[in-house]
Regions:
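Periplasmic polypeptide-binding modules associated with outer-membrane biogenesis and secretion
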Residues: 2-139, 168-182, 328, 348
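Outer-membrane beta-barrel domain signature
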Residues: 11, 79, 137-143, 172-176, ...
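Transmembrane beta-barrel architecture of outer-membrane proteins
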Residues: 20, 88, 147, 180-182, ...
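Outer-envelope beta-barrel architecture signal
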Residues: 100, 116, 127-131, 146-148, ...
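Transmembrane beta-barrel strands of outer-membrane/channel proteins
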Residues: 106, 133-137, 148-150, 164-170, ...
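Residue-level signature of outer-membrane beta-barrel architecture
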Residues: 124, 154-156, 189, 231-233, ...
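Transmembrane beta-strand segments of outer-membrane beta-barrel domains in Gram-negative
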Residues: 195-357, 414-415
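C-terminal transmembrane beta-barrel domains of outer membrane proteins
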Residues: 314-425
Length: 425
């Protein structure tokens, strides 16, 4: 207000100060804040009426998406309108899953210029098919070091917000002989605004092609079924936290040549073992301008009723009671992008078994868990911890292709307590 301070006439000075303050507020983004002059007291005064967002409306063809976006924007209702902050929030909306495009407008509510209506028009275009194919050399020990992975993801397949994921993997040696194959399908379906359910089925076959002893014809077949429900406890434009609970059922068969053979701890004379467990916990995820993070705390509880009486007896001989198998775990990860070509990734995981666990409940170490430079799975145990950090630099980029240099450092340890003693590695 310095330019108007030297004006001698009180009325002219008041009007000039009001105009200067209005211009400054508008330049700072307070576009519907108004400055009024008052003649009482005689010296006059300036009255500033803050412009606010009085109402938020979201329009579009997808009712579920409209409700979600309105809930995310509802905290704006009643707040002071500042255009740069509002534009930043709208830009974050465009990054949300299911949003193909957004148009935002501000309208006056009635005749009051300080009360604005925010109108968001959403285009919920159907998500396109996404795929990924990669060739790597971090296969599984015994099943070949060369690894091929293929993934297909289709969102909005049956209804808005759902997702179908197809995954395939093969491992071979240099001959090439097929050592491992895996195929899985999973589907996620939203039920309402907060609840979603997921189901998955996977089948795999592992042949120990790299082992000559005790017998090169040892192989395993595994079937896995998973069902899980996620419930969103809270969500903002930058973060989401939710609870989850699921049931996993696993069946593994051991073979010597083409004949079933009891190769598994707990398997009977027919060579197969079925176990299952519940997994439940809390999780959170979020992102900012340069960072993203996620974390979860979970519990595991074995289910005895999924194994046969003979299998329970054999497992009990080794001190494993599926109905008493319990564990607690924690997973954390974070990504920081300090510059356009640089990215720092940190991740850690830990699990503590409260009682001896069945095999599928354990924690594994390998590149599948973030430990680069190792096979997909090297070793597993009931309890364990791991940590890994990597700093990636994009040395060359062209379109969708790029070459990265990724120095990394990682370590882990697992252990299993049985009646015979502790196994660790």
């Amino acid at each position: 207000l310095a330019p108007c301070a030297d004006i001698q006439d009180p009325a002219a000075r008041l009007q000039a100060c009001a105009a200067a303050l209005s211009s400054r507020l508008y330049a700072d983004g307070y576009t519907n804040t108004r400055v009024y002059t008052r003649q009482d007291p005689p010296a006059g005064l300036l009255e500033v009426v803050e412009g606010r967002i009085a109402e938020v409306r979201v329009e579009g063809p997808d009712g579920r998406l409209n409700r979600r976006l309105r809930n995310l924007l509802l905290p704006l209702q009643g707040t002071v309108l500042r255009l740069p902050e509002l534009e930043a929030r709208v830009a974050r909306l465009e990054r949300l899953s299911g949003v193909a495009g957004i148009q935002a407008s501000l309208n006056r509510l009635g005749s009051d210029p300080t009360r604005a209506v925010l109108v968001i028009t959403v285009d919920s275009g159907r998500r396109t098919l996404q795929g990924d194919l990669s060739l790597r050399n971090d296969g599984s020990t015994g099943s070949g070091q060369f690894r091929g992975l293929a993934t297909l993801l289709q969102g909005d397949l049956v209804r808005s917000g759902d997702a179908l994921l197809l995954y395939g993997e093969v491992n071979t040696d240099s001959q090439p002989n097929l050592g491992y194959s895996l195929a899985s399908i999973s589907y996620t379906l939203p039920l309402g605004d907060r609840l979603q359910i997921s189901g998955a089925f996977g089948a795999s076959r592992r042949n120990l092609i790299e082992f000559d002893r005790p017998d090169p014809d040892l192989s395993f077949r595994q079937l896995q079924v998973l069902g899980q429900a996620d419930y969103t406890l809270g969500e903002t434009l930058n973060s989401r936290w939710f609870g989850f609970a699921g049931l996993s059922v696993n069946r593994t068969d051991g073979y010597l040549g083409a004949r079933a053979f009891p190769l598994l701890l707990g398997a009977g004379s027919d060579g197969w073992l079925r176990t299952g467990f519940l997994r439940f916990g809390l999780a959170a995820e979020g992102q900012g301008e340069r960072i993203s993070w996620s974390g979860s705390a979970y519990g595991l509880q074995g289910v005895a009723g999924l194994s046969t009486a003979e299998q329970l007896k054999i497992l009990g001989f080794y001190g494993i009671e599926p109905g008493r198998s319990k564990a607690l775990g924690l997973q954390l990860s974070g990504v920081w992008r300090p510059a356009r070509r640089w990215q720092l990734t940190l991740q850690a995981a830990a699990q503590q078994a409260l009682n001896p666990l069945t095999g599928a409940m354990g924690i594994s170490l390998g590149s599948d868990n973030g430990l680069r430079g190792l096979p997909g799975q090297v070793i597993s145990g009931d309890s364990g911890l791991l940590g890994e950090t990597e700093l990636s630099w994009s040395a060359w980029q062209h379109g969708q292709a790029e070459i990265q240099l990724v120095p990394f450092l990682g370590a882990g340890r697992v252990s299993t307590n049985l009646q015979e003693g502790t196994i660790s590695g």
